[in-house]
Amino acid sequence: MRGPCSVITALLVVASSQIAAESDYRLQAYHHDVTAVGNAVVKPLPKRYLRGSQHVLDSNEERSVYSVLASMINEGVSKMPQAAEAVEKMPQAAEAVEKMPQAAEAVEKMPQAAEAVEKMPQAAEAVEKMPSAAMAGKKVSRVTKTGKKMPHAAEIEAVEETLHATNARKEPLRADFVEEMPHAAKAKEEMRRAKQHDLLRATEEADEALEKSWHSSEDTAAIGGASRGISSNVILSLKKWKNNFQGMRAMAVSGEHEDIIKPIHEAFVRLCGENMEPTTKEMTLIRNMLDWDVAASPESSHRQNLVSQAQRHVLIGLRIMQRDPEVWNEWNELSESLRFGVLDYLLNLHYQRWVRMYNIFKRHRPDKKDVPMNDKLSLGGNTDKNSALALQTHSKKQNLYPDEPSNVAWTSKKRDGSVLIERSKRTFNGNTDTASVPYKQLKMQSLKPVMPFLTRSTTSGHHSVSIKNPGLSFDGPIFAFVPPNVHKSQSLTPPLVHKDVDTELSLGGIYDRSTHKAPTVP
């Protein structure tokens, strides 16, 4: 019985393979292995039969056939898991076969090639204007997401709209259209590379312009010895942005210690000067940073947080500007290099302001000791050049805190438009630098209504940006300021309400409030 059973089993295996072949969805792995084993066995089979029959007639025939079938069955059993998995997928294959007529019908409804080619943009002209792929591949790197249309984006959108429009007409397929498809795909890939190349070139031009205009001051060397804070002689590159806003959630100021927080904030404002006007929340963030227990490198960690705060303010400024369609459209009409230049410069201005506030608070610690009056350190409201220079000279001679920064800002008028010229000398913690806006006129008339949106206070007050806004999500813990040595028996008071930098420009003396007024945001 073993012989017939083995033969029947082999026939069943062969029959199942033929059935799978008829459905045009063969069990490839199983069929391949069975075929290989069968070929290997059938080849030496005549020799085995003859060797067995030489000694005893018909003595080894049954055993030879059985051994061959047994090896085939064992090999098939080892492959059964793969076969079972393939069998499970057979219903899906049958369903796909049923949908083949629909696929064929969809192919017949594709647009005509002639009409699509007629409505395509001038591919040859676009390719001639695009840089070579090799140069683009070398220079393309990680670029910032700007959310605006790049060069040649209009052509790509026109192609897609043409395809959608012609696809709706359900016209038959043309052979020449199929031939043109690879060329269209290649042209689209070249356009994508051109966009990345143009974006990279614009950011590089913005970085070069900033490096030319942002020079360190070597004539006013270190004052007071070694540095005791974060150096301000640093240029942040727009290309190296890392949008990691962990811990950038809005800060909460405890209202139950108003009588303690208020004098600390007032003392800190006197130390910084009127033109910086740090808010209570900004002071809270700096105070909490100084109290963090960072074992490795606290200043490096603090610097990274100040960079993140500067990035956050730039993005919030863009978000506020986007709320006004007129201003946003005017902003998008500017060239990419000019837009990146403005964002790059604003990023460094915000960072400089945060570094100054951090170093001042770290040096004097108004939360832990009394701070003397510093009314002579007022740096705000100076629009006249002579008054600014006089203030600078006076501060050099009689400044109570010689390490404090002294800023001068004015606006000069020319026939072609308004050119903002800013000079700032910062001599705190032994680090000095001088920042000046490039003298090159970069369409400042167009930038005039845009700059207030980007430079206004975005930390608190009526014009703050909610963290629930999907465009700006800052995850992380909520900061809270609780002064030291506070008794639990102290009575609770209403939440602390403080005056922010309101709607006027205040970037550490970079823009003066009497020369530029920020428009009201609805």
From Swiss-Prot:
<feature type="short sequence motif" description="RxLR-dEER">
    <location>
        <begin position="48"/>
        <end position="63"/>
    </location>
</feature>
<comment type="similarity">
    <text>Belongs to the RxLR effector family.</text>
</comment>
<keyword id="KW-1048">Host nucleus</keyword>
<dbReference type="GO" id="GO:0042025">
    <property type="term" value="C:host cell nucleus"/>
</dbReference>
<keyword id="KW-0732">Signal</keyword>
<feature type="signal peptide">
    <location>
        <begin position="1"/>
        <end position="21"/>
    </location>
</feature>
<keyword id="KW-1035">Host cytoplasm</keyword>
<keyword id="KW-0843">Virulence</keyword>
<protein>
    <recommendedName>
        <fullName>Secreted RxLR effector protein 105</fullName>
    </recommendedName>
</protein>
<dbReference type="GO" id="GO:0005576">
    <property type="term" value="C:extracellular region"/>
</dbReference>
<keyword id="KW-0964">Secreted</keyword>
<dbReference type="GO" id="GO:0030430">
    <property type="term" value="C:host cell cytoplasm"/>
</dbReference>
<comment type="function">
    <text>Secreted effector that dos not suppress the host cell death induced by cell death-inducing proteins.</text>
</comment>
